[in-house]
């Protein structure tokens, strides 16, 4: 099976606090993987490294590869980082949309990387690009809102627009950082259904950070759980049982309680 994401010996330190400890990880084509862990476990930090939003420590041998291209090596971004980012869709917890633009215009932003510079200066998109944007909105059930200002949408609707933008980008990998953290249960279900649909029907690799273990078990075949910057579990979601759950979360709570008591 083709390896889409390769992480070797990744470490990250923030102000003398080590957030990641020599993490190794391989993710294969077509997988839908959940990154789990308590707050501060390093899951979002790991995800941001995958597309080079942040760089790791200058550790000997550290290396991140995405879609066959080096993203960063020993704390330095690759010079051609834009080439790997061009096919990587990143979905943020806070949507990262332009509120003053319409839904359709926000989705068209996904085409900027493949659009000649002079056309981007005038926000000129071809009829074919606009048609593809409408098709992407149809896929996520948002085509009827195409000409509505994005600021008028609910959080769940905005998150689906962000997914449509990734489809417009023709992403081969989608990295979703807590995409349902601020959503009500029904909106969260729709967003996760949408991510699973494009994973299963388009073959797009999806890596998603989640706090909700039940969603990880329901939607992702593989779980990578982090605990204090270490990979605690990496395997089939069906084998992530109550004992592992308790050890991952309750032991962290005891550490926090002891620290407060001290």
Swiss-Prot record:
It is an enzyme of class 7 (translocase). The gene is phnC. Part of the ABC transporter complex PhnCDE involved in phosphonates import. Responsible for energy coupling to the transport system. SUPFAM superfamilies: P-loop containing nucleoside triphosphate hydrolases. This is Phosphonates import ATP-binding protein PhnC. It is a peripheral membrane protein. One of its GO terms (molecular function) is ATP binding. It catalyses: phosphonate(out) + ATP + H2O = phosphonate(in) + ADP + phosphate + H(+). It comes from Escherichia coli O6:H1 (strain CFT073 / ATCC 700928 / UPEC). Residues 5-253 form the ABC transporter domain. Pfam families: ABC_tran. Keywords: ATP-binding, Cell inner membrane, Cell membrane, Membrane, Nucleotide-binding, Phosphonate transport, Translocase, Transport. Its main location: membrane.
């Amino acid at each position: 099976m083709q390896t889409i994401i390769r992480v070797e010996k990744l470490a990250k330190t923030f102000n003398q606090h080590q957030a990641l400890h020599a993490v190794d990880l391989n993710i294969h084509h077509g997988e839908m993987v959940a990154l789990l862990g308590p707050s501060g476990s390093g899951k979002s930090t790991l995800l941001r490294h995958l597309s080079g939003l942040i760089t790791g420590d200058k550790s000997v041998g550290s290396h991140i590869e995405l879609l066959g291209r080096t993203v960063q090596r020993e704390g330095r971004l690759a010079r051609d980082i834009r080439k790997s980012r061009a096919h990587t869709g990143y979905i943020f917890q806070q949507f990262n949309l332009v509120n003053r633009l319409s839904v359709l215009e926000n989705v068209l932003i996904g085409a900027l990387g493949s659009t000649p510079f002079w056309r981007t200066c005038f926000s000129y998109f071809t009829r074919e690009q606009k048609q593809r944007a409408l098709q992407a909105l149809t896929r996520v059930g948002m085509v009827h809102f195409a000409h509505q200002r994005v600021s008028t949408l609910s959080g769940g609707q905005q998150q689906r627009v962000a997914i449509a933008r990734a489809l417009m980008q023709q992403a081969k990998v989608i990295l979703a950082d807590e995409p349902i953290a601020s959503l009500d249960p029904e909106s969260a279900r729709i967003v996760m259904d949408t991510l699973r649909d494009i994973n299963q029907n388009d073959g797009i690799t999806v890596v998603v950070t989640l706090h909700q273990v039940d969603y990880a078990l329901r939607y992702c075949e593989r779980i990578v759980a982090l605990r204090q910057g270490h990979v605690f579990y990496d395997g089939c979601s069906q084998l992530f049982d109550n004992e592992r759950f308790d050890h991952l979360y309750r032991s962290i709570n005891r550490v926090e309680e002891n620290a407060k008591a001290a």
